[in-house]
């Protein structure tokens, strides 16, 4: 029945136009064409003469010409026609308007939508006549035309709307209505709307929406209308509402000047864009091409659910609607029906693919077309590990240093003026003793004070005053730079000293210690991300795409698009964190732009997608507890480097006890440190002399250096170093060496055109000194390195551990997202990506933890030994240094097997220095295993998995960047093929392109016997060093891949190893790219290439890594906790009553209903898997910190906290034997939606975990905010003991949340138990254990499930450690099998204690109160929540 009959052909109008599929060879690359010269009947006769070999599904487009011929429609139809079995027919406007529906050409699928002038009645009649498959329901389009019906449907679906009322007027008697108008309000049907409010016509076709302002704001109204030129609204002084017509009156939502437009394609895909609100000023912002400026935004999890609900409720597959984000909530204010995204090639690809698959899935069975939805790599992200096995990628964690920056500069001065103290108090400096000022208004206040003091000091001359005047002048000049405050490139830090600053690092000689308190003012400027740094970050982001699966097939488009499509769904859980430094945040934004193929400026990307981690210590280094250790190290370092004698054996032992190769090489270059410092100082003097001479040259008057620097600023930079490096005593300030190296490296790279003499020698000597000073400042011995490192990055280590452990907790994901099965093997799987952008200190520290913390025994692990040797040869962790942890899951292994989860550790030293090839080549990896050597070999290579399709187009952003051809070496044989899965061989194909060569993210080095060249492999790009892939212990078979995909393999040839070793490993940055006008980086100097990732180890298990991280955190928790407690106690005595750590004040809102974690949300059903897009990072596990919703089906905030706390126990202390227990959840693909997920845990793991919790030394607190902070990574010791604070203030404790009662109760319970233990020590294990369980049940009034919620239960009732004998604690894990025997007795005992001391009702009321406080705190304070919310935790 697929063919058209002759009668139907004769009846069709001659004005209908046909789009034919890509099967026609003459239609060119676009795949479609429009026949306008022939009549339709002739066309059909031709088709009948050439009976098509295959059935065709005809897709009819029924819309007004303006819509059906629009650019988005044309782009999507072009792509739709690439489906072999689809033929697209466009009904002409004349046919639609003038022909009866019986004469309209028949079709099997109809895409029809209403717009101005469209006869919707005829379209409905046609659909009844032909009964086609409707993409957008036609009857519901009547409702979409009436805003009253739209709001009614939205309300019925439980979707949040602004508060509104409908005013219906009878046209005959418009004065008869329920409207009472006041000066600053209107009352509609009894509902009062104070100004500002919005007045909307009930007809959706009427775009004359008015917003009325209150008289206090000047009154009048803003009149919105459909865009006319560059205007979308005008202001009117008229303040009275309209007197004729029916309207909807609704509350005005303050949206910070932006509207969010959401575009769905089916219930499972949504794209969101933000635009300037037309209500702001009415001016439409347009780009250079005249298009309205929009930028992609990320939708929160709840907003994605709204998109699905809107799509389903209105039965519109393609549907657009408007979101207002205000007050931490999102509201739907309009549903537009059929609507496309404009100017997004990625959206066009995805839209056509989804529509085509939808049509084929619905209609293909009727025509016996052999078709099924292809299982793609983004459905199951199975990729090759570097060891060659095929596994599912589950988690990518990357810690990345910021990009190239301008030299950092710093000035310190002591201030005692009352105005500075007033400023310090105004911004809350006394709460912590420190204050950081970055915002423009804050810097303006500092500048105002500085100007005032300078005016006063002019009247008081004197030597001391002159020095202070000089510093104030410098402070003033720096703050006045650029003529504006960006808040990114300058900051002022104030530190309170109760007895004055004891010493000044600036070399000031204070005659006596001032008795009065003073403030140390530290001004920092410079350190801005350069255009080169932006290019580096953006390009590295593009390269990172290639670590992710997908992107193969006809819709690949460009390298890495698999990640983009993955990210457009629920399946990519991406969060990007950055410290509060401007260069770090801009690096993160540029990286996100490249990673997600975003467009536009970095600022909106930064605002939308990069989370600041500066409030929790996650990525910033303000740890004071380790300053003593660092001072000792620096003092010893300075002492050694101040010796005017060649290095002797003792110096080598003292300075390089770890035997680092790079350190020994630098020391051999230095020989005598003082003599080298003399040379460096002389070269700096010569340099400043050359700059002064150049400034006298008239031709250099207007000379502009890199990044708009002038010769004056350059001289100022070097003169300060010249003054500070050699002190008055003649000794050298070793701490200035990194700054000197920083400056000369910057000038050699960016200002080489000046031709200054001696810079190369200065670079060589300062680098040698810096290569000693910088790494050794983080510790000289192994123990010092680990101690200092953990002090810097303990919160980050905990966060990494949490990230790794929560990857298999799919159940918590399901609670927030409709992950419906699409028939794939594992529909709900996610790739969890966490990117942490930070500064050099954290990268050094984290690497030190892995190198010296005892991850593996290098004497027993040859691969780790080679990795340590490679790291030892790295002299500098340059810009864009990366430490990448990748977690894979082997679904063929037993869930409890240690081989189930596979961890790889990768590293890159960042951008290449000015000395090309200064970093060592990667060492390559072939895990030495007798099993590997004995196995039969099989030809194949990972890299041959990258087929180059002629039809694939290169990355559009990289088309202008020609790359040199690089031969990619491939091993001839690769043994031990295992774990290969059907349909999983398309990995890394997103890296193929039509370019002759590409950026390879893995460098090459291989024995000559294993080298061969392949036409496929040579066109691959890759993120990792081919050393890893070539030396892998196993790899998929290339022949199998070619056989599966029908590809012909080109002949292979040998390529000598040396040719590969000396080809630059990475050639992705080029002058042509940097200077191309479309890339916006004109004036960039040569951007250095980045070293590829080298695999440090590719055979780690998750248990190994988890135990290692837990051990490192545990080892340093106690001492750190004591130091922090002492610091807090001392500061608490001086703090005001509004202590920042006190519990949140009680707010009033209905308490949230707790739901058990295994319960499925009410909307969970068995539809297709969700693929909702948000063009920006989305969290499939949590709600965005800035958006909390009141939808009827949302999970409670407390539920989310419980889920977060499940992983928290893994961050804390381990049982007596130091081995944590892990609860691995099985995949839920076989369960019904109503069934709770099956949790499998080792026998006794529940009991071990609970006992573990009772023995932990963790602050005793109920306050949920503490738990949130702890999960983010704040060290336990840095969060004060809330119970102790509240005990000091009994009124606060009684009136707020009374957290101490539960703690006291638990103590009494344990005292009772310990008394029993003395009589019967064998039962002590059971008693302590089970009381915890029963107490948790009674306090929380819900059962404690095995292996899942024990952490949060005990966390909230406190953990008294002093009452538990150490010996029984150690024996708990050995006797877990006997614990259930005494359950009833313990239950009765604990019940008696509860009844005696405190009724359980009171405890449960406290719990409800806390839940209420947390939910309201989150709703009321979105700024704080942005830092502390669950989304930030995940």
Curated annotation (Swiss-Prot):
Chain spans, region Polyphosphoinositide-binding domain: 384-455
SUPFAM superfamilies registered for this protein in UniProt: Phosphoglycerate mutase-like
Gene Ontology biological process: inositol metabolic process; inositol phosphate biosynthetic process
InterPro entries, sorted: Acid_Pase_AS (IPR033379), His_Pase_clade-2 (IPR000560), His_Pase_VIP1 (IPR037446), His_PPase_superfam (IPR029033), VIP1_N (IPR040557)
CDD domains: HP_HAP_like (cd07061)
Reactions it catalyzes: 1D-myo-inositol hexakisphosphate + ATP = 1-diphospho-1D-myo-inositol 2,3,4,5,6-pentakisphosphate + ADP; 5-diphospho-1D-myo-inositol 1,2,3,4,6-pentakisphosphate + ATP + H(+) = 1,5-bis(diphospho)-1D-myo-inositol 2,3,4,6-tetrakisphosphate + ADP
Localization of this protein: Cytoplasm, Cytosol; Cell membrane
Name under which the protein is recorded: Inositol hexakisphosphate and diphosphoinositol-pentakisphosphate kinase 1
Gene: Ppip5k1
